[in-house]
Amino acid sequence: MSHLVKMENGQSQTIQEMLGCIERYNPDHLKTLESYVQDQAKNNTYDLEANLAVLKLYQFNPHMLNFDITYTILLKSLTSLPHTDFVMAKCLLLPQQMKDENVQTIIDLADILERADFTLFWQRAEVNRNMFRHITGFHDSIRKFVSHVVGTTFQTIRKDLLKELLGGIEDSTLESWIKRNGWKNQGQGLVIVAMQDDKIKTKNITEKIEFDNVGALMAQCL
């Protein structure tokens, strides 16, 4: 869905155009931006700049604060891990937002993810499942982050452990994630995450520098 912002001169701009000018601080545009946040949750899209603009408008206009939109922005930022979007969003929260019980729950979930305690995360996610039920693709976005961590941590991993880290998924879904990440079943309940040939190898790099490139610099040193 295309969101257009109505300007005072009667013209319309896209949200991206509006965010590039002083109009991003106009509270008259907040409702349009909040609707855009809701569309991101529904359609599995993501716009960090627009979401941060909403939080900034809440800072300037605390009487317009919408907690449901705040929750959605924070949860959407979690889907962007390992990027630091959540930290940036958290830094824009007002004291009354920080004191909110649901905000604290989301912050706790973020802390659990950042320390890679994925088993605990899925347990807490199940308890709080209604919080992000409206966010399309939330679970798979977290599984993508889990896969990133697994890929940088393991060379081989037990299949049952991998299944647990990905949220206790079905065997068929597990096979789909193994294939998606380019991993391979080794047999005996093991999954190869990184092949021996994929290990980082040192490489000597020789760069040819012409005398003309450094001649002027050498002359200054004489």
Curated annotation (Swiss-Prot):
Taxonomy of the source species: Eukaryota, Metazoa, Ecdysozoa, Arthropoda, Hexapoda
Gene3D superfamilies associated with the record: ARM repeat, domain 1 (1.25.40.250), Winged helix-like DNA-binding domain superfamily/Winged helix DNA-binding domain (1.10.10.10)
KW RNA-binding (keyword) present: no
Chief location of this protein within or outside the cell: cytoplasm
Gene Ontology terms: cellular component: cytoplasm; eukaryotic 43S preinitiation complex; eukaryotic 48S preinitiation complex; eukaryotic translation initiation factor 3 complex
Native organism: Drosophila melanogaster (Fruit fly)
UniProt keyword annotations, A-Z: Cytoplasm, Initiation factor, Protein biosynthesis
Protein name: Eukaryotic translation initiation factor 3 subunit K
Role: Component of the eukaryotic translation initiation factor 3 (eIF-3) complex, which is involved in protein synthesis of a specialized repertoire of mRNAs and, together with other initiation factors, stimulates binding of mRNA and methionyl-tRNAi to the 40S ribosome. The eIF-3 complex specifically targets and initiates translation of a subset of mRNAs involved in cell proliferation.
InterPro entries: ARM-type_fold, CSN8_PSD8_EIF3K, eIF3k, PCI_dom, Transl_init_fac_sub12_N_euk, WH-like_DNA-bd_sf, WH_DNA-bd_sf
Annotated ranges, domain PCI: 46-208
Annotated Pfam families: CSN8_PSD8_EIF3K
Annotated compartments: Cytoplasm
